[in-house]
C-alpha cells in the first residue's frame, strides 16, 4: 500500500526545540518565497487577473509550489486566483482521499480529474520499459483540456532548479542538443502558457521544507519506482557533484541564463558566413568544397 504522511503542521513546531532550530524552518520558508517571487518577477510569470492552475501530484515539489503561491498571493503586487488540480490516473493503491482532505483543510479551491491513463500506459509500454514519456504526454493532454475548459490563463508546474539542470544534461547526453526547461513557455499548440515558479529553488530546500511542513506525500508507484532511468542517473551525477564540488550545479543553472550564441556552433542562431568580409559575394556550399576533396581522393 502507498505510504502517506500526516497533514501539515504549522511551521512553528510546538515540540521543544533550541532557538536556532525553531528559526530554521521560518528562514527556509522566507528563502523559498524570495526565490519564487524573484522567478515570477524575472520571467513575468503572473499578470493581473490571472487564473493560475497549480498541477498538484501529491509530491513534495507540487505541494511546495502551491504553498509558496498561497503565501505570495496574500501580498502579491497583482491580484490573481489559484486553483489546484490533480489528475487521478487510477494507479493501483492510489489514496484518492488524501489530496481532497488536505486541500479542504487549507481552504484551497480544487478539482480532481479522473482519467485512467495508468491502464493505457501499462497496456502500450512493454514490461520493464520506461513509462515516463507516454505517461507525461497523456497527463499533459488531460491538464491542457481542463485549462481550456475552465478559463485558466497560466499552468503552474513544480519543476525546480535541479529538474531544469538535469533536463539540460539529458538533452546533451541523449539527444545531442543544448536545451533545458524554460521557466515560462507557450505550449506547442499556442493555447496555453506554462510557468515554473520553482525555477530558482534547489531540490534539497524543497525536501527540507516538505519535511518541516509534514506534507502528506503520495509516492508515484508508476514511474518513480522504476530503476536505472536516465534521469535518475543524471540526478545521481548532480548529487555527486554537489557533494564533491559545492556550487557547481548552481553555476550550471546560472549559465542557462547567460547564453552566448556566437560562441557556439548553431548556424541558425549566428551568421558565421558573414564574418570576415566578403559577405556580399556568394560562398560555395559544402558540395563545392567536398567535390575538390573527392577529386584529390580519386587521384590518390
UniProtKB/Swiss-Prot annotation:
<feature type="binding site">
    <location>
        <position position="135"/>
    </location>
    <ligand>
        <name>[4Fe-4S] cluster</name>
    </ligand>
</feature>
<dbReference type="InterPro" id="IPR012089">
    <property type="entry name" value="tRNA_Cyd_32_2_STrfase"/>
</dbReference>
<protein>
    <recommendedName>
        <fullName>tRNA-cytidine(32) 2-sulfurtransferase</fullName>
        <ecNumber>2.8.1.-</ecNumber>
    </recommendedName>
</protein>
<dbReference type="GO" id="GO:0005829">
    <property type="term" value="C:cytosol"/>
</dbReference>
<keyword id="KW-0067">ATP-binding</keyword>
<dbReference type="GO" id="GO:0034227">
    <property type="term" value="P:tRNA thio-modification"/>
</dbReference>
<keyword id="KW-0808">Transferase</keyword>
<keyword id="KW-0820">tRNA-binding</keyword>
<dbReference type="GO" id="GO:0000049">
    <property type="term" value="F:tRNA binding"/>
</dbReference>
<comment type="pathway">
    <text>tRNA modification.</text>
</comment>
<dbReference type="Pfam" id="PF01171">
    <property type="entry name" value="ATP_bind_3"/>
</dbReference>
<keyword id="KW-0460">Magnesium</keyword>
<dbReference type="InterPro" id="IPR035107">
    <property type="entry name" value="tRNA_thiolation_TtcA_Ctu1"/>
</dbReference>
<keyword id="KW-0547">Nucleotide-binding</keyword>
<keyword id="KW-0411">Iron-sulfur</keyword>
<comment type="similarity">
    <text>Belongs to the TtcA family.</text>
</comment>
<dbReference type="GO" id="GO:0000287">
    <property type="term" value="F:magnesium ion binding"/>
</dbReference>
<feature type="binding site">
    <location>
        <position position="132"/>
    </location>
    <ligand>
        <name>[4Fe-4S] cluster</name>
    </ligand>
</feature>
<keyword id="KW-0479">Metal-binding</keyword>
<dbReference type="GO" id="GO:0005524">
    <property type="term" value="F:ATP binding"/>
</dbReference>
<keyword id="KW-0963">Cytoplasm</keyword>
<comment type="function">
    <text>Catalyzes the ATP-dependent 2-thiolation of cytidine in position 32 of tRNA, to form 2-thiocytidine (s(2)C32). The sulfur atoms are provided by the cysteine/cysteine desulfurase (IscS) system.</text>
</comment>
<keyword id="KW-0819">tRNA processing</keyword>
<feature type="short sequence motif" description="PP-loop motif">
    <location>
        <begin position="57"/>
        <end position="62"/>
    </location>
</feature>
<comment type="subunit">
    <text>Homodimer.</text>
</comment>
<keyword id="KW-0694">RNA-binding</keyword>
<feature type="binding site">
    <location>
        <position position="223"/>
    </location>
    <ligand>
        <name>[4Fe-4S] cluster</name>
    </ligand>
</feature>
<dbReference type="InterPro" id="IPR011063">
    <property type="entry name" value="TilS/TtcA_N"/>
</dbReference>
<dbReference type="InterPro" id="IPR014729">
    <property type="entry name" value="Rossmann-like_a/b/a_fold"/>
</dbReference>
<dbReference type="GO" id="GO:0051539">
    <property type="term" value="F:4 iron, 4 sulfur cluster binding"/>
</dbReference>
<dbReference type="GO" id="GO:0016783">
    <property type="term" value="F:sulfurtransferase activity"/>
</dbReference>
<keyword id="KW-0408">Iron</keyword>
<keyword id="KW-0004">4Fe-4S</keyword>
Amino acid at each position: 500500500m502507498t505510504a502517506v504522511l500526516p497533514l501539515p503542521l504549522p511551521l512553528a513546531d510546538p515540540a521543544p526545540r533550541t532557538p536556532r532550530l525553531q528559526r530554521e524552518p521560518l528562514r527556509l520558508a522566507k528563502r523559498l518565497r524570495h526565490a519564487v517571487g524573484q522567478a515570477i518577477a524575472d520571467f513575468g510569470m503572473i499578470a493581473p487577473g490571472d487564473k493560475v492552475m497549480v498541477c498538484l501530484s501529491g509530491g513534495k515539489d507540487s505541494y511546495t509550489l502551491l504553498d509558496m503561491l498561497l503565501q505570495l498571493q496574500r501580498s502579491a503586487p497583482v491580484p490573481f486566483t489559484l486553483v489546484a488540480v490533480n489528475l487521478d490516473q487510477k494507479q493501483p493503491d492510489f489514496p484518492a482521499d488524501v489530496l481532497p482532505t488536505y486541500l479542504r483543510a487549507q481552504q484551497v479551491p480544487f478539482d480532481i480529474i479522473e482519467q485512467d491513463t495508468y491502464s493505457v500506459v501499462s497496456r502500450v509500454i512493454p514490461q520493464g520499459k520506461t513509462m515516463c514519456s507516454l505517461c507525461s504526454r497523456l497527463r499533459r493532454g488531460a491538464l491542457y483540456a481542463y485549462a481550456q475548459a475552465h478559463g485558466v490563463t497560466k499552468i503552474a508546474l513544480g519543476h525546480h532548479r535541479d529538474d531544469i539542470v538535469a533536463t539540460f544534461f539529458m538533452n546533451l547526453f541523449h539527444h545531442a542538443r543544448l536545451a533545458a526547461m524554460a521557466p515560462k513557455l507557450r505550449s506547442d499548440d499556442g493555447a496555453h502558457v506554462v510557468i515554473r515558479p520553482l525555477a530558482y529553488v534547489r531540490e534539497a530546500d524543497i525536501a527540507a521544507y516538505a519535511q518541516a511542513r509534514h506534507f502528506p506525500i503520495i509516492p508515484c508507484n508508476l514511474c518513480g519506482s522504476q530503476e536505472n532511468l536516465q534521469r535518475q542517473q543524471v540526478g545521481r551525477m548532480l548529487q555527486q557533484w554537489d557533494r564533491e564540488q559545492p556550487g557547481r550545479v548552481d553555476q550550471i543553472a546560472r549559465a542557462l541564463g547567460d547564453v552566448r550564441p556566437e560562441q557556439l556552433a548553431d548556424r541558425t542562431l549566428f551568421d558565421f558566413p558573414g564574418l570576415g568580409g566578403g559577405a556580399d559575394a556568394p560562398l560555395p556550399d559544402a558540395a563545392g568544397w567536398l567535390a575538390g576533396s573527392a577529386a584529390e581522393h580519386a587521384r590518390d
